[in-house]
């Protein structure tokens, strides 16, 4: 009786081993299902076809690493190329802008009546009629840019005057 149990267990284990080694697959052909069998290392793919489970298409991490490697190589090549062959600098005309402060105190010469002097936070006084910038002449004789509008040459009115004019 004991040997019968051992033989039964052995046959049952063989049956389990053989059924695990195969995959039972099916698909619909018309209205009825059609069954077929694939090996254990294959996957069912549809109409009676089996594909290997570790095919290159299913390895998403392989494709991800491949794309990251390609992007890294392109980026490294771009930066190496920029380092070895820097872009040529185009000679642009020099544009000199100089800022000069007016001397402290009222300027000598005639003063215009009704034109008050405004002081900047540093305490220097300036004449609103004289421009606070100096354009350096170009070699051709005419300036490279037109002068700024006249309202740019005068400082803004004091706060008290603006408040009084609004009331």
UniProtKB/Swiss-Prot annotation:
Keywords annotated in UniProt: Cytoplasmic vesicle, Endosome, Lysosome, Membrane, Signal, Transcription, Transcription regulation, Transmembrane, Transmembrane helix
Signal peptide: 1-21
Cytoplasmic side of membrane: 81-167
Location relative to the cell: Cytoplasmic vesicle membrane; Late endosome membrane; Lysosome membrane
One cellular component (GO) term of this entry: cytoplasmic vesicle membrane
Annotated segments matching region Disordered: 101-167
Biased composition (Pro residues): 104-113, 140-159
Principal location class: membrane
Chain segments annotated as transmembrane: 60-80
Membrane topology category: Single-pass type I membrane protein; Single-pass membrane protein
Residue ranges that the UniProt entry lists as topological domain Extracellular: 22-59
Function: May be involved in the transcriptional activity of NFKB1. May regulate WWOX role as tumor suppressor.
Family as reported in the entry's similarity comment: Belongs to the VOPP1/ECOP family.
Protein name, per record: WW domain binding protein VOPP1
């Amino acid at each position: 009786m004991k040997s019968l149990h051992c033989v039964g267990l052995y046959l049952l284990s063989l049956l389990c081993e053989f059924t695990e080694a195969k995959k039972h697959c099916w698909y619909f052909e018309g209205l009825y299902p059609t069954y077929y069998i694939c090996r254990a290392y294959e996957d069912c793919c549809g109409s009676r076809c089996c594909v290997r489970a570790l095919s290159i298409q299913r390895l998403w991490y392989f494709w991800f690493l491949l794309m990251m490697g390609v992007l890294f190589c392109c980026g490294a090549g771009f930066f190496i190329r920029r380092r070895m062959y820097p872009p040529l600098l185009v000679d642009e005309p020099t544009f000199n802008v100089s800022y000069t402060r007016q001397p402290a105190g009222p300027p000598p010469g005639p003063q215009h009546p009704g034109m008050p002097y405004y002081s900047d936070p540093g305490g220097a006084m300036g004449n609103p009629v004289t421009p606070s910038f100096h354009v350096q002449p170009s070699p051709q004789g005419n300036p490279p840019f037109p002068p700024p509008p006249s309202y740019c040459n005068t400082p803004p009115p004091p706060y008290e005057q603006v408040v009084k004019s609004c009331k």
